[in-house]
Amino acid sequence: MADAAADPTAKLTESTAKLQLDEETGEMVSKGELKKRMAKRAKKAASEKAKAAKDAVAKAVGAGDSKPAPKPKAKPEEVVMDPEAMFKQGFLQEVYKERPSENVVTRFPPEPNGYLHIGHAKAIAVNFGFAKYHGGVCYLRYDDTNPEKEEERYFTAIEEMVRWLGFTPYKITYSSDNFQKLYDLAEKMITLEKAYVCYCGDTEIKLQRGGEKGASPRFRCEHANHTVEENLQKFRDMKDGKYKPREAFLRMKQDITDGNPQMWDLAAYRIKTDTPHHRTGWDWKIYPTYDFTHCLCDSFEGITHSLCTTEFVQSRVSYEWLNKTLGVYEPMQREYGRLGITGTVLSKRKILKLVEEKIVRGWDDPRLYTLIGIKRRGVPPRAILDFVNELGVTTSVSVIQIKRFEQTVRKYLERTVPRLMMVLDPIRVVIEDAEPADVELAFSPKDPNMGSHTIKFTPTVYIDRADFREVDSKDYFRLAPNKTVGLLNAPFPIKATSYTKDETTGKVTEIRAVFDKETKKPKAYINWVGTEGSKKVEARIHNSLFKSEKPDDAEGGFLNDINPESEVIYPDALIESGFDEVKRRAPWPEAAGESELGMGGPESVRFQATRVAYFAVDSDSTDDKIILNRIVSLKEDAGKV
């Protein structure tokens, strides 16, 4: 114990481990110093608030209203979210009560025509989570009824995202598994006089459904009067390729007088002959529509609760009508509000435009809100599920600001990833009287289970350019000429004695310094990286891809709203040697689809760069070059939408 007490490195390590981040200045300071600063700011804020309240009262009195300003609400304490909360209460609890079942069966039925986005994460969490909570199972069913838009890469990516979020499908099925069964039921519909072959074009169909504004009387087309035998023959002719696409289609004979458009004789089968199906090849020339396929596949698979978003509320009527008409098992469809996010675009067409214009690197660009983009950025899967759970599930559409999503991610990372020291824009500092020393650093000041690692303090270190000023000021507490600042976990604070500049660029290239052994507790501490074991990395700082919350409303279209600072690259950043152990022990954390050591891609190597941001390794990294993506900042960026 005596040796430890005499060791300045040990004392400083113990002392600096208790430092806290001043979020306003980005400095690490002692608890006492932070308390003083916060008190000063609170006093200033209270003064400004009192003045504003006084002005408001004066204004109100002048208007004949002397009511005092309302008291501010107390800030609620942070509550740890129950990961099963959305199934225990509210909408999903009521859904289960409507049809309680010992054998809950749900399904997630995406179309394999694009990459999933953040909204699909809610659908995955709701359907798989509902089944899991009630001890049931969930199918992953590909709704592969449109060969013109389906590609193998989408099938693969969808399954990967489901598993990455921590869910295992009970079975992976395809609507195309049931093509023959669906066809047979379509013929049965004809024999029941509940379907007919129609030759009408778009203009005629619009007239039948009430015209341009829906003000005219609705009526059924003359083709509905054909006999069962005629319709059967013509439907078989469609199957045999005797019609070209759009020359004929099979319609359900529903109720054209019903006020619900989903009962206006919807299409059941259409002709598609230009592209082979990814699984059945050229076997079929006709394909069932979503409205015909979806409810029947739910029935075939014994789905108990068919959970979908509220744009399908009207479809519930046709869903139930078709199952009843055919006399098959009837699942229960219920609808919840979808998840949207402002400040970005989720449309496949618009994202494709961004890719084609090379505004982003691809569908997995970390600035996009595709799930593969969010994953590449380094957002942990469990954080996404926490976000969905925090929002809850109701019948209202949730349109959320990006900052709300990032708050959840930040809160999750704070307690689950290790801390390392890193500098984005390094300046060399030569400490003239320093000796090499070992410094032990905890990976987390709050979680001892994360362990610790040892780095080497060296006479030459690197600090961030943002932590040095050539001209000092009273309100600046970091390094400046003849000024002292603490280096996190270093033996002593340092004082800058001189600096050198590049004559061409005017940038500082080197700072000379000495230990300041007289100053026991500097007002601020900054991070540093030594020369031994450190690594050069490329750090990509991702900001919002768009300048506004509503890029679609921008004059000239969403492409005119691109933020020119959406990606800022630091090509020469440095990270300390503890990175090697963090990489070896990934994933951070072990949760959801990254539940075991070694599971997860490079993005599962996550950490907090002290005083900088949260980062993850990018998939562009190689053995010779490490590339990091900023996941989120340490605090909400000022001015962020």
Feature annotation, model-predicted:
Residues 106-113, 139-144, 299-307, 365-371, ...:
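Glycine- and acidic
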